[in-house]
Curated annotation (Swiss-Prot):
Pfam families: AAA, AAA_2, AAA_lid_9, Clp_N, ClpB_D2-small. The Clp repeat (R) domain probably functions as a substrate-discriminating domain, recruiting aggregated proteins to the ClpB hexamer and/or stabilizing bound proteins. The NBD2 domain is responsible for oligomerization, whereas the NBD1 domain stabilizes the hexamer probably in an ATP-dependent manner. The movement of the coiled-coil domain is essential for ClpB ability to rescue proteins from an aggregated state, probably by pulling apart large aggregated proteins, which are bound between the coiled-coils motifs of adjacent ClpB subunits in the functional hexamer. The gene is clpB. It comes from Mycobacterium leprae (strain TN). GO terms for biological process: cellular response to heat; protein refolding. InterPro entries: AAA+_ATPase, ATPase_AAA_core, Chaperonin_ClpB, Clp_ATPase_C, Clp_N_dom_sf, Clp_R_dom, ClpA/B, ClpA/B_CS1. Residues 1-146 form the Clp R domain. This is Chaperone protein ClpB.
Amino acid sequence: MDSFNPTTKMQVALTSALQAASSAGNPEIRPVHLLLAMLMQNDGIAAPLLETVGVEPDIVRNEAQRLLERLPQASGCSSQPQLSRESLAAITTAQQLATEMDDEYVSTEHLMLGLAMGDSDVAKLLTGHGASPQVLREAFVKIRGSARVTSSDPEFTYQALEKYSTDLTAQSGEGKLDPVIGRDNEIRRVVQVLSRRTKNNPVLIGEPGVGKTAIVEGLAQRIVAGDVPESLRDKTLVALDLGSMVAGAKYRGEFEQRLKVVLDDIKFSAGQIITFIDELHTIVGAGATGESAMDAGNMIKPMLARGELRLVGATTLDEYRRYIEKDAALERRFQQIFVGEPSVEDTVGILRGLKDRYEVHHGVRITDSALVAAAALSDRYITARFLPDKAIDLVDEAASRLRMEIDSRPVEIDEVERLVRRFEIEEMALVNEEDEASKERLETLRAELADQKERLAELTARWQNEKNAIDVVRELKEQLETLRGESERAERDGDLAKAAELRYGRIPEVEKKLEAAVPTAQAREDVMLKEEVGPDDIANVVSAWTGIPAGRLLEGETAKLLRMEDELGKRVVGQKKAVHAVSDAVRRSRAGVADPNRPTGSFLFLGPTGVGKTELAKALADFLFDDQRAMVRVDMSEYGEKHSVARLVGAPPGYIGHDQGGQLTEAVRRRPYTVVLFDEVEKAHSDVFDVLLQVLDEGRLTDGQGRTVDFRNTIPILTSNLGSGGSEEQVMAAVRSVFKPEFINRLDDVLIFDGLNPEELVRIVDIQLEQLGKRLAQRRLQLEVSLPAKRWLAQHGFDPVYGARPLRRLVQQAIGDQLAKMLLAGEVHDGDTLPVNVRPDGEALILG
């Protein structure tokens, strides 16, 4: 034992065995102490060794614990426990095994074999469970592979591939991967590249969410099904996890050592293992230190070139360009396979293939029209992401929302429950009252309470029954999916008897139960729980994500849109043509007959100041979003210089503020359904109009970072007072002198606002007084303004040059100032009504 050189884990096991024997009062360290000490190690090799031979470690641990309890105990013994004869023999055998295997250290697996080869109770226990020395040795070689114990901490090199990777073929065999629909050409290209002699390393390049990882999962499913050429038959496809390989690597060289062990395992498999690395660009620089150029990418280059490592990678176009293309030696070892975004039709096919999985997971039914809506609406409205990922997410969230409603108490039950609680509180208050009225009320209340309790019980029972019926359907679908998976596995394994029993016996039986259960779940017409995901549910999720009303027009909204001119006319006076044009544009968009590749409507409002151009934009925002501030306002007077154009779309690369985005593009990205007001557009530099050309024609704009911002759901409104006061021909001549023909031609309409007549001014006075009245209502004050007073305000508040804007100032001065003085002097009190009339001399208004 002089040359005994244990590993760290071996030393820990011996120390733990000594402590266990000492604390239990055992005079000797027996083999059972050693076995338990090894099984207690969290990341030790003993438990995996037993699992490999089909023995449950917990069962062995429990039986060993019972053996330990039967050992003799010595009380009052101050000496330290010594190794027993059997333990010493096991350690000696372990040392001999280490020498035989050309290992430099004695490790816990050597000791495990030494215990099994002895004649102790532990040896009988292990052999009795099927862990004989021969079986353990075979498992030991399988776990260790080609590795030798050359360090004091060798355990991390065992089962390195299993530790730092996921077996996709095993997951596919167990039915854990989602079905892959389509993508046959891409999978065929991957198979072709993998079948090459050298540089057999395909890399899938495409935008995020187009299905690169799904293609690799599809390859794993084909390998399991045997639907691949002979060169890939029975191969293992593993997904390497570089994150877990880097995690916990505290010392320099530890990551490289882990990676080398994994690569050696792959190399010694003689082409049996195909490796997949998602986010392939992460290999560049992974594990590199400041002075060293040895990263994961450089470590795998030689194996890639020689064809010893068959690697499938997946990364996005930007990251491939940024990381892989910089290293020409690494890039030439890969064969690019471009993965494009599927069409809407292909996406519908993919969703149909995934439908069953999502129905089973959420326990709801998903209609085919919902799948079509998910593909179409995501393509139309969610422009920053890619199909099929965004469509799958829509279906998933819509089903999740419906499941949450099923699991929550219906609103109807909540309302009755609150009513019952209120009646019970009222009953407790009336019980002690002696007067006749209270007694009569108590009697009536108790009758109502009994009725409501009965109704609550009935509703709760109905809800529970409907919920149970839905859950039964969900459980049967889960059973059916499990049985189908078992049937496929039995066919692959050649167990035709089991496959026939499942296919022609148990599966039809469950299908029959499911057919009977589905009508039960839908039996009543007045169901409390909705269990079907339809197009409206998908549209609601789109609206929640983007703020765009993508759902069908509700009855209330239809009526609101039809009387849109009246609603806008309450705030914008005397501009019927402009109001009508804007209303038509909004109706076209909501009815779905507008061009989907252009903005909802784009207008140039012309006319003198103060006639309602900006007010119409505010009124439109208020009508659509119930908030007049819900619009993007760009004051074009701030963009009078050539270089200020960059503020709209963001600074170009290399300039300060490049990472901040543009004021216009960022605002529309955050709120894609909005009114965009370009106020006083004639004051902007002419280059600004060139930027707006793409917005008006194609409904999109590219910002300084190269991202496309979608303007198709916006209403761009440009206001200007060019040629104000002139005839229509003069106004249009002024417009043509400032704006280029291609700019004017892209607008939906150029609207010239008319001047205001006296009657319209009185209506504007009413609007201003109504706004003042809302502010006074907080103090319960009312104004009674006479018609002469309104005409006086209209006459004195209008200026042909300034339009109706001075009216607001006049209302504040003529009424607001007097009212403020009266309030401060205590002449007016809350709840008073103040008449407003013209003074006899006609010079001012008088209150009170």
